């Protein structure tokens, strides 16, 4: 528990859901937590809170069950929980000003995260970033269609049409790759696609899409997705 300046809040831990935790749960599912009018993501877009991985759904982020009981976050890059949250808030949710410890919204969110952390201590979760992009073997296109629905469709809408996507800022897949040959001459479009999925907006790639670590999406699932998209 390393949310600096929140000592007083710790006193309520273990007393069941508090009104603040309930407000925090609302904020967790609310894209309006971010002040940016272009943001359509809430914490719940990318994180489950379940103790066991949900079936039929692939989240970019880890489950936040027991998150407040972990010793560090982001594979050890973050040693303060608020910083770990602010990473998502600014990088993905287009938040301009990071959440501060004494902001009532941060406090409520923190209490909610504590309320979904029943164990006093929990192990840090592995987070394996794929830094060097290499091609992956293509898998089953049928499987790839399932991967698309489970991992990408919430934000990108239906494949080939984008139907149902919450924001047009997320391009239609795989059609967006049609320009890759011109934009990235000499690089196979499949590789550009893999880089986007593995790096999100990092390592020179722009945007606000989350990255997928190996734990979130295996190379096998990625290969199936590429087969489905004939990339
Ligand atoms: C667009 C997707 C996205 C959104 C929105 C998002 N996150 Fe994340 N978050 C990630 C990814 C990807 C990671 C890195 C993988 C991981 O550790 O879960 C991450 C990591 C984290 C971690 C570190 C977990 C650990 O143990 O390493 C915390 C804590 C966290 N997010 C909390 C939040 C909270 C709270 C919100 C809402 C304010 C939020 N995130 C919004 C994608 C997102
Ligand atoms: C949380 C929402 C979200 C999820 C989930 C998501 N994306 Fe995205 N994606 C976006 C947004 C927003 C953009 C446009 C901004 C950007 O490029 O980051 C984007 C852009 C892209 C691009 C285009 C990059 C370009 O400009 O050429 C590709 C390719 C892509 N996503 C693939 C995927 C795949 C494959 C998945 C599933 C494994 C996925 N995305 C899941 C939100 C998401």
Regions found by a protein language model. Give the residues of each.
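Inter-heme linker and motif-flanking segments adjacent to c-type heme-binding CXXCH motifs
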Residues: 52-53, 92-98, 116-125, 135-137, ...
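Periplasmic/extracellular electron-transfer cofactor-ligation site
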Residues: 29-63, 119, 145-183, 198-207, ...
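Amphipathic alpha-helical surface "interface" segments used
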Residues: 102-113, 128-143, 213-218
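Extracytoplasmic electron-transfer domains, predominantly the class I c-type cytochrome c fold
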Residues: 19, 54-98, 109, 170-231
């Amino acid at each position: 528990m390393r949310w600096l300046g929140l000592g007083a809040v710790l006193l309520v831990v273990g007393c069941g859901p508090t009104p603040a935790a309930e407000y925090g749960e609302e904020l967790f599912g609310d894209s309006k937590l971010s002040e940016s009018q272009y943001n359509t993501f809430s914490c719940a877009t990318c994180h489950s809170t379940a103790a066991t991985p949900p079936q039929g759904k692939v989240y970019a982020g880890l489950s936040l069950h027991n998150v407040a009981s972990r010793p560090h976050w982001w594979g050890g890059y973050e040693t303060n929980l608020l910083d770990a949250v602010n990473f998502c808030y600014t990088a993905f949710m287009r938040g301009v000003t990071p959440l501060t410890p004494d902001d009532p919204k941060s406090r409520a969110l923190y209490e909610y995260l504590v309320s979904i952390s029943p164990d006093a201590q929990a192990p840090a979760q592995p987070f394996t970033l794929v830094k060097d992009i290499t091609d992956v073997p293509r898998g089953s296109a049928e499987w790839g269609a399932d991967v698309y629905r489970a991992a990408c469709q919430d934000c990108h809408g239906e494949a080939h049409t984008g139907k149902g996507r919450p924001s047009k800022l997320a391009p239609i897949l795989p059609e967006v790759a049609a320009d890759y040959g011109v934009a990235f001459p000499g690089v196979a479009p499949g590789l550009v696609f893999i880089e986007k999925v593995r790096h999100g907006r990092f390592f020179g790639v722009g945007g606000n899409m989350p990255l997928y670590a190996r734990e979130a999406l295996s190379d096998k699932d990625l290969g199936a997705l590429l087969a489905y998209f004939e990339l």
